[in-house]
Structures are given as structure tokens and as C-alpha cells.
Regions:
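Hard-cation-handling environments
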Residues: 1-14
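Glycine-rich, acidic loop segments that terminate in or are immediately followed by a histidine
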Residues: 14-110
Length: 110
């Protein structure tokens, strides 16, 4: 299923953001890993959550940028928690979808 979804996106050297409904943390990480390993984005962020509650679980993945630093920066701006390795970070943001997208775009600008 995730392979089909990943196939919908072309290879890209730009950041990729994906919001999906109803995924658990394992699925979020799997989809993020698949997308960044297939070079669908320079940095990939997959989120799943609830706009009404203002909470999104996330995974960030990249082989080109340190995900620990990105996660820390985004957590600070989005009332988030989480961490990880240089290749992948995961956690939860307490913010609106638009805020998450805006901060991701700001933090991944070249």
C-alpha cells in the first residue's frame, strides 16, 4: 500500500510534506522511510493527526540533512516533543496543520 502511495510522487531534491489520516506511529515512520529512501524529497515529513485537536504525530527523514537538529528546531516552534537520529526523527506537534507546514518550509529552506 505504501509502495503505491510512494510511487505517486516523482523523485525530487525539494522538501516533501505529506499529511495522512489515521496512521499510527509505525506506519508514519514506514511511509517516511520509503519516501526519503526513494529520493521523493530532500527532506520528507509525514504527519498524521487531528486538526480539531491541533495535534499531529510526525516523522522526518533525510539522508542529506540532520533530522535531530530539524526536529529540535520544529519542536521548539510547534510545542512538540520527540527526537531521533541523524536520518530520522519522530514525535508529536501541538499545532495547526498550516503552522506545521509553514515551519517545515521555513526550516528546510536552502
Amino acid at each position: 500500500l505504501f509502495g503505491l502511495k510512494a510511487g505517486q510522487y516523482p523523485k525530487s531534491n525539494r522538501p516533501l510534506t505529506l499529511f495522512e489520516e489515521g496512521l499510527n506511529m509505525v506506519q508514519i515512520r514506514q511511509l517516511c522511510t520509503l519516501l526519503y529512501e526513494q529520493e521523493k524529497g530532500s527532506v520528507v515529513m509525514v504527519c498524521s493527526g487531528n486538526e480539531a485537536q491541533g495535534e499531529y504525530q510526525y516523522a522526518l527523514g533525510s539522508s542529506l540533512m540532520d533530522m535531530r537538529a530539524l526536529s529540535k528546531a520544529m519542536n521548539g516552534k510547534l510545542y512538540g516533543r520527540g527526537g531521533g537520529s541523524s536520518l530520522m526523527a519522530q514525535g508529536t506537534f501541538r499545532a495547526s496543520r498550516q503552522s506545521v507546514m509553514d515551519v517545515f518550509q521555513e526550516e528546510t529552506k536552502s
